[in-house]
């Protein structure tokens, strides 16, 4: 994927998501829609899913920078003895981390969540402008997203927003609460 395709995808999908969420009444935007992967008492709204994607995009930008400066892109996930953590342990820590971010931003007006997302998206586009074509095709060892390249993962931010919108739209909370 080249830089033009990446920028188009990022902008098109961000606009798609903002149009849908921006048209929603506040009560619908903030209504619990999905179950937390971390806290059995917590529920996620469309707004929570939206701000979650900002956290991941910010984290991926840091990963790209580490990788391109010769550091390990993916942060090592090791136990105290130096052996790799299990996937269950890794996912539990990721879910706790994202739940903490969700709680930190819960109840904020949607326009504030958009502003936070705009700041991170600006960083993403600035990074895209700084990267060479070779940088965009550089593979991040162990990265499970997209094709594993910096450019592919960067473009996957767009897919991530649509994926979370879809999960919130399914609304398993209402189904579970129905008699």
What function would you assign to each model-found segment?
Residues 37, 97-105:
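A short small-residue
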Residues 26-27:
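Short amphipathic alpha-helical segments and their helix-coil junctions
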Residues 2:
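Short Lys/Arg-rich basic patches
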Residues 9, 103-119:
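A short, structured beta-strand-centered segment in the mid-to-C-terminal lobe
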Residues 7, 11, 15-18, 30-95, ...:
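Short, contiguous alpha-helical
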């Amino acid at each position: 994927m080249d830089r033009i395709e990446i920028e188009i995808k990022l902008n098109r999908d961000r606009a798609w998501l903002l149009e849908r969420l921006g048209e929603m009444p506040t009560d619908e935007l903030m209504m619990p829609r999905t179950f937390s992967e971390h806290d059995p008492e917590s529920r996620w709204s469309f707004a929570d899913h939206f701000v979650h994607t900002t956290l991941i995009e910010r984290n991926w930008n840091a990963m790209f920078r580490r990788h391109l400066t010769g550091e390990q892109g993916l942060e090592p996930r090791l136990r105290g003895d130096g052996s790799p953590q299990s996937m269950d342990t890794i996912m539990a820590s990721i879910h706790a981390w994202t739940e903490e971010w969700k709680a930190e931003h819960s109840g904020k007006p949607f326009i504030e969540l958009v502003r936070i997302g705009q700041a991170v998206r600006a960083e993403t586009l600035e990074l895209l402008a700084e990267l060479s074509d070779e940088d965009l095709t550089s593979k991040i060892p162990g990265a499970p997203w997209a094709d594993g390249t910096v450019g592919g993962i960067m473009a996957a931010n767009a897919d991530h927003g649509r994926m979370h919108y879809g999960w919130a739209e399914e609304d398993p909370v209402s189904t579970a609460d129905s008699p």
